[in-house]
């Protein structure tokens, strides 16, 4: 926990100037608060006894001024602390988002999207509440606590000793409850993350849910998660509800002892009635902050639990990093060479078993094989989305591990099977391939991708909103925009991962024409399901269980009569049956 406080403070450090000003405001506001009981003591001790009207008027005005100044200082304190909290949260969100952009693909494959989203939203929001509200309260109540204690010592040090009786008990109680509150708060954040994950998953699959008529099933699933969250929330609420009364009871014992012993002192003439009343007001001032601090302490445990979840993400190892002496890869010609490459997703189970291949600049290398044969893994290894266990991958003689990831991926364009577009306009999505591109270049890329015609027919042309993940477009339209985006990037190396397999025959023909334009003059790796799209490939590689079992041109492999030939015959037969 100490480490969490320390790390959280590292985000506050840049705003130390404002924090000091906020603390000064807190001190002055608390000082005004502490001044009022002293004025009341003066009323009882001097004004009522001496019937001093001038002093009464002065004290009355002083009380008004004290509360006015208290309000001014409280405003400054709350505004400054809110500013600090908001800036810290911006910095934390930026840090975690920056980290997420650098984490390996495998990190996201092992976690639900909603859980990752919850780190950036729910956990950071819990941290914000802790900083903006409860840190302010902790500062204010601590100042009142210390100030009241100091005034009590000045008034009657023997009576003050009675208040110290409860300090060890309060400290022990808050320590016990604090540990349990942190644990339940951590569970609460996990349950909220579970709800976010389920919600994200259900909304993404709403068509599937409707098609299988599983609305009631999903409602039941959500209800169970909601109930689990309720149970976690109530466990935390139970502890919070218990903490304040326990601390308040201990404080009441102290006040009763003060009243009993202080009353005897007044009766014996060792203490004035005004001093006792002032002392009791300060004692109440002492007990109230202790009671409020117990609640604040519990809420801060929630913020710390959320912070630890966030810091766990920030501490996640970046498995794929640039070498200390990594160089920027220059513009390449496109020679890609894999030598005895081995790779495994799970330790001890090789997904790629010593593969070697070479693509000359401008060549088209097609990779075919059954599902799970390792085709897409090869596509992920070339841009270094994963690191190989042994062997080497070289581009124009540069080992891809010896150059920066950014300079490597700038040379590679990828058109995946599942097209990913962003919520925005057609123009913005194509421009994503090159943020510095001109309007003329964007239109030219769209024309090359056979997309300009349908874009021009849209209500707002290139400024048409396409919806989340391009939901307002057809599959073929989405794919052509993705191709236009790749054309605009103008990479020397292309990876097409079954780019047309999900399209109907008509859409496939249009998209294939666009792909043919895209492939000209570029080294390309085409992962294909439909063999008709790779007939013109310079080399066709057939994979099976992570190994290359055949390689050659289309005609050579047909003549060989092996796996490729059988796949081709099967697809030809299916095509004839469809016709």
Model regions and ranges:
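A short amphipathic helical element positioned immediately N-terminal to and/or at the very start
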Residues: 2-16, 116
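ABC-type nucleotide-binding domain
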Residues: 315, 322, 329-579
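Transmembrane helix-loop-helix hairpins at lipid-water interfaces of multipass membrane proteins
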Residues: 19-73, 80, 153-158, 256, ...
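Helix-loop-helix
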Residues: 51-54, 151-165, 235-308, 313-314
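Juxtamembrane helix-loop junctions of ABC transporter transmembrane domains
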Residues: 1, 24-25, 32-41, 45, ...
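Hydrophobic alpha-helical transmembrane segments of ABC transporter permease domains
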Residues: 13, 24, 32, 36, ...
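An intracellular "coupling" helix at the cytosolic face of ABC transporter transmembrane type-1 domains
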Residues: 105-106, 124-131, 135, 139, ...
């Amino acid at each position: 926990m100490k480490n969490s406080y320390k790390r959280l403070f590292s985000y506050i450090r840049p705003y130390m100037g404002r924090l000091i000003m906020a603390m000064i405001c807190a001190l002055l506001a608390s000082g005004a608060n502490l001044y009022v009981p002293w004025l009341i003591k003066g009323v009882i001790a001097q004004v009522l006894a001496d019937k001093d009207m001038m002093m009464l008027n002065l004290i009355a005005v002083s009380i008004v001024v004290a509360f006015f100044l208290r309000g001014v200082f409280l405003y400054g304190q709350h505004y400054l602390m809110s500013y600090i909290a908001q800036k810290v949260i911006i910095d934390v969100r930026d840090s975690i988002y920056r980290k997420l952009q650098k984490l390996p693909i495998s990190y996201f494959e092992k976690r639900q999207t909603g859980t990752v989203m919850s780190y950036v939203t729910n956990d950071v929001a819990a941290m914000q509440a802790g900083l903006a509200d409860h840190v302010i309260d902790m500062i204010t109540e601590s100042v009142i606590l210390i100030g009241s204690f100091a005034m009590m010592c000045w008034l009657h040090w023997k009576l003050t000793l009675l208040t110290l009786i409860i300090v060890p008990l309060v400290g022990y109680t808050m320590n016990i409850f604090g540990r349990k509150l942190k644990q339940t708060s951590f569970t609460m954040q996990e349950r909220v993350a579970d709800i976010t994950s389920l919600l994200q998953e259900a909304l993404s699959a709403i068509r599937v849910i409707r098609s299988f008529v599983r609305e009631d099933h999903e409602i039941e699933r959500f209800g169970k998660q909601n109930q689990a969250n309720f149970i976690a929330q109530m466990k935390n609420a139970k502890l919070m509800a218990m903490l304040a009364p326990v601390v308040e009871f201990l404080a009441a014992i102290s006040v009763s002892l003060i009243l009993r012993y202080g009353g005897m002192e007044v009766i014996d003439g060792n203490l004035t009635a005004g001093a006792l009343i002032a002392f009791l007001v300060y004692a109440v001032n002492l007990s109230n902050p202790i009671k409020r601090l117990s609640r604040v302490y519990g809420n801060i445990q929630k913020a710390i639990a959320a912070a630890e979840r966030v810091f766990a993400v920030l501490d996640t190892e970046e498995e794929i990093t640039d070498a200390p002496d990594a160089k920027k890869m220059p513009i390449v010609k496109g020679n890609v060479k894999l030598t005895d490459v081995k790779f495994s997703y799970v330790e001890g189970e090789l997904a790629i078993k010593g593969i070697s291949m070479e693509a000359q600049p401008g060549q088209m290398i097609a990779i075919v094989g059954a599902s799970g044969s390792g085709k897409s893994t090869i596509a992920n290894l070339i841009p270094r989305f994963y690191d190989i266990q042994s062997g080497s991958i070289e581009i124009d003689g540069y080992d891809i591990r010896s150059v920066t990831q950014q300079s490597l991926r700038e040379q590679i364009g990828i058109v995946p099977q599942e097209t990913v577009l962003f919520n925005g306009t057609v123009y913005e999505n194509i421009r994503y391939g090159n943020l510095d591109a001109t309007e003329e270049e964007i239109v030219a890329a769209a024309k090359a991708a056979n997309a300009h015609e349908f874009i021009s027919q849209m209500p707002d042309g290139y400024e048409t909103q396409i919806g989340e993940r391009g939901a307002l477009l057809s599959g073929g339209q989405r794919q052509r925009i993705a191709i236009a985006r790749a054309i605009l990037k103008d990479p020397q190396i292309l990876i097409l991962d079954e780019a047309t397999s999900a399209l109907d025959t008509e859409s496939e023909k249009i998209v294939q024409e666009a792909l043919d334009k895209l492939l000209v003059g570029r080294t390309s790796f085409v992962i294909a399901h439909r063999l008709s799209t790779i007939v013109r490939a310079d080399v066709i590689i057939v994979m099976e269980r992570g190994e290359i079992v055949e390689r050659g041109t289309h005609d050579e492999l047909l003549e060989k009569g092996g796996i490729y030939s059988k796949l081709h015959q099967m697809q030809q037969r299916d095509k004839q049956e469809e016709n």
